């Protein structure tokens, strides 16, 4: 199937990240190239965009979609947790703009073979990068009940995590769990009928939790945000689009930590307190989609965009 993914908050991304001619931008989750396709013309003449994605199919789609930009764009299959090393290997000292569009793409959800969706029966996979060894089937069939409980609770914020984990373990004793349909049926059986009738699909939180664990999503996000100090040029902008509270909390805390102001007396020539103001917030509160965008693209409903800017100069002059 063709790689399709409608970029969310596109107008807001362009306004807040404000790409300019000659700048260097990184789209750390290039997907099908939707955001990049809108950013690139604003970088010309003389600008460049580096796009990253873990998914080989996304990389192929982005290369095809952005081919017209020639040498002004490079698409690489990579995990954004390695961004600093990727830039260093290319001799790039810093970037003017950086965008993260977190989570799973529409293509990955809609392609049954990828095993992300609880809406269709498919092989239980959930790997964002097909070169990964760990699959959802491996997790649900082999991880201890205690570990499954912890993952479903922490990453899915699922109140029925202990029951779901217990039902998974009991079911796999009878036969291996190999499809999304099997797993959905087990989850539905584990959650009491009254709870199933309210709110979202009963499997939503468990599928989210497994996907996050399998792909190391939150660890990768933390690792990438820890590199902002060394990656962003003075005045450089970073934007992160998140889709659930766990991601947004990590982004909010990282931006807050990097916004720590120096507490030294004004007369000191060199900072001795160890606190440095690396980022200043561009958005005081997360930007959310308009009602019109949600109507046009319902999957944008839970999106939140936070943007920050690298300070022009540290107090110690670095």
Curated annotation (Swiss-Prot):
E.C. number: 2.1.1.199
GO biological process: rRNA base methylation
GO cellular component: cytoplasm
Alphabetized GO MF terms: rRNA (cytosine-N4-)-methyltransferase activity
Gene3D superfamilies: Putative methyltransferase TM0872, insert domain, Vaccinia Virus protein VP39
Enzymatic reactions: cytidine(1402) in 16S rRNA + S-adenosyl-L-methionine = N(4)-methylcytidine(1402) in 16S rRNA + S-adenosyl-L-homocysteine + H(+)
Top class in the EC scheme: transferase
One Pfam family in the UniProt entry: Methyltransf_5
Record key words, sorted: Cytoplasm, Methyltransferase, rRNA processing, S-adenosyl-L-methionine, Transferase
Role noted for this protein: Specifically methylates the N4 position of cytidine in position 1402 (C1402) of 16S rRNA.
Family (UniProt): Belongs to the methyltransferase superfamily. RsmH family.
Protein name: Ribosomal RNA small subunit methyltransferase H
Gene name, Swiss-Prot/TrEMBL: rsmH
């Amino acid at each position: 199937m063709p790689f399709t993914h409608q970029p969310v908050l596109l107008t807001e991304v362009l306004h807040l990240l404000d790409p300019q001619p000659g700048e260097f931008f990184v789209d750390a989750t290039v997907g099908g190239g939707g955001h990049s396709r809108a950013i690139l013309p604003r970088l010309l003449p003389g600008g460049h965009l580096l796009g990253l994605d873990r998914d080989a199919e996304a990389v192929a789609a982005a290369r095809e979609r952005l081919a017209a930009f020639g040498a002004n764009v490079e698409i690489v299959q990579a995990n954004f947790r390695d961004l600093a090393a990727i830039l260093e290997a290319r001799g790039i000292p810093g970037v003017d703009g950086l965008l993260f569009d977190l989570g799973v793409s529409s293509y990955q959800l809609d392609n049954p073979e990828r095993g992300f969706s609880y809406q269709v029966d498919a092989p239980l996979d959930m790997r964002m990068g097909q070169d990964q060894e760990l699959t959802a089937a491996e997790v649900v069939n082999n991880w201890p009940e205690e570990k499954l409980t912890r993952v479903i609770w922490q990453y899915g914020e699922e109140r029925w995590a202990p029951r779901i984990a217990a039902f998974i373990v009991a079911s796999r004793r009878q036969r291996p769990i190999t499809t999304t349909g099997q797993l959905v049926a087990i989850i539905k059986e584990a959650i009491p009928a009254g709870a199933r009738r309210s709110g979202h699909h009963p499997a939503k939180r468990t599928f989210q939790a497994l996907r996050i664990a399998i792909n190391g999503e939150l660890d990768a996000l933390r690792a990438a945000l820890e590199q902002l100090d060394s990656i962003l040029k003075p005045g450089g902008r970073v934007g992160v689009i998140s889709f659930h509270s766990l991601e947004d909390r990590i982004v909010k805390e990282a931006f807050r930590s990097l916004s720590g102001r120096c507490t030294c007396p004004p007369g000191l020539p060199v900072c001795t307190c160890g606190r440095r103001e690396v980022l200043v917030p561009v958005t005081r509160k997360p930007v959310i989609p308009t009602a019109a965008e949600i109507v046009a693209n319902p999957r944008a409903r839970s999106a939140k965009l936070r943007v920050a800017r690298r300070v022009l100069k540290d107090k110690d002059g670095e």
